[in-house]
């Protein structure tokens, strides 16, 4: 992972970011994954922050729906993405 502007950026996404491919499913899943990881680390420190916990659950659901869509449309891209982001397969 590389640091860019205070945020962690995976090397494979930097190229896509320069191409302004923000609407792609892969980039959206990447964004949700970064937000999820940031919220998870916040919740480790603030265990009673229930509104953030609810937000985390919503983000997890959104990411899961996008991953289900990608798995249905293009299984190869789905497999590549989950291996690059190091997330579990559903």
UniProtKB/Swiss-Prot annotation:
PANTHER family registered for this protein in UniProt: RIBOSOMAL PROTEIN S15, BACTERIAL AND ORGANELLAR (PTHR23321), SMALL RIBOSOMAL SUBUNIT PROTEIN US15M (PTHR23321:SF26)
Regions annotated as coiled coil: none
GO terms classed as biological process: translation
Recorded family membership: Belongs to the universal ribosomal protein uS15 family.
The gene coding this protein: rps15-A
Organism whose genome encodes this protein: Oryza sativa subsp. indica
Phylogenetic classification of the source organism: Eukaryota, Viridiplantae, Streptophyta, Embryophyta, Tracheophyta
Subunit structure: Part of the 30S ribosomal subunit.
An MF annotation (GO) of this entry: structural constituent of ribosome
KW Cytoplasm (keyword) present: no
Database matches in CDD domains: Ribosomal_S15p_S13e
The UniProt record lists the keyword Ribonucleoprotein: yes
Cellular component terms (Gene Ontology): chloroplast; plastid; ribonucleoprotein complex; ribosome
Cross-referenced InterPro entries: Ribosomal_uS15 (IPR000589), Ribosomal_uS15_bac-type (IPR005290), uS15_NS1_RNA-bd_sf (IPR009068)
Protein name per UniProt: Small ribosomal subunit protein uS15c
Subcellular location: Plastid, Chloroplast
A family per Pfam: Ribosomal_S15
């Amino acid at each position: 992972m590389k640091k860019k502007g205070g945020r962690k950026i995976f090397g494979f996404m930097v190229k896509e970011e320069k191409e302004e491919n923000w609407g792609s499913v892969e980039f959206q899943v990447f964004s949700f994954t970064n937000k999820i990881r940031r919220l998870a680390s916040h919740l480790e420190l603030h265990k009673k922050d229930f509104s953030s916990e609810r937000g985390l659950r919503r983000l997890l659901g959104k990411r899961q729906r996008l991953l289900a869509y990608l798995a249905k449309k293009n299984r190869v891209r789905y497999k590549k993405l989950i291996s690059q982001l190091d997330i579990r397969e559903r």
